């Protein structure tokens, strides 16, 4: 029992030290937010594999399966999108990297790219996420955007900020790109 408590505390401490992608909050209403994200460097895997398979490929990349054999720090959040044809997962790269300095992946399925600056809307929720919770919060997100007469661009996706080992105070989001004029 003592070991388990130590493991949970240590893991939580390690996870809380992850760099988190920066954004500006434009509008906040309870668990709903409109945000502006500047461009950022990301690594992406898109495949017909499960999310676990995509995570493994991205984790291998940041663990040294890259042109420099270097370990790249884990950051938050992790972006996930599932549709009928493929699952996509993206890791945000640490802000100290750019396209010229980031190690190149050895795995051809891992793509490095610079995202565009965009507006997003999200609904935040806690606990361990599952498809039922995600669908509930996605509907809440669409309802709020409809109330505000804000149009979406693309599909809603899932964003996770925590390791699966974190038990308390988990942070998840249903998020979508929006057409927004500030």
Located regions from the model:
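A solvent-exposed interaction/effector surface
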Residues: 2-182
């Amino acid at each position: 029992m003592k070991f388990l408590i130590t493991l949970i505390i240590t893991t939580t401490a390690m996870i809380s030290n992850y760099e988190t992608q920066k954004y500006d909050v434009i509008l906040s209403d309870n668990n709903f937010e409109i945000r502006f994200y500047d461009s950022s460097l990301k690594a992406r895997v898109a495949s017909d594999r499960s999310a676990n398979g995509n995570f493994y490929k991205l984790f291998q990349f940041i663990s040294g399966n890259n042109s420099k054999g270097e370990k790249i720090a884990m950051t938050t959040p992790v972006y996930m999108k599932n549709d009928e044809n493929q699952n996509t997962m993206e890791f945000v790269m640490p802000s100290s990297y750019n396209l010229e300095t980031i190690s190149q992946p050895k795995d051809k399925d891992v793509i490095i790219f610079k995202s565009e600056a965009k507006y997003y809307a999200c609904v935040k929720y806690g606990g361990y996420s599952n498809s039922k919770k995600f669908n509930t919060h996605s509907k809440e997100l669409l309802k709020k955007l409809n109330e505000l007469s804000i149009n979406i661009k693309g599909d809603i996706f899932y964003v996770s900020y925590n390791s699966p080992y974190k038990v308390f105070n988990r942070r998840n989001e249903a998020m979508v790109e929006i057409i927004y004029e500030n």
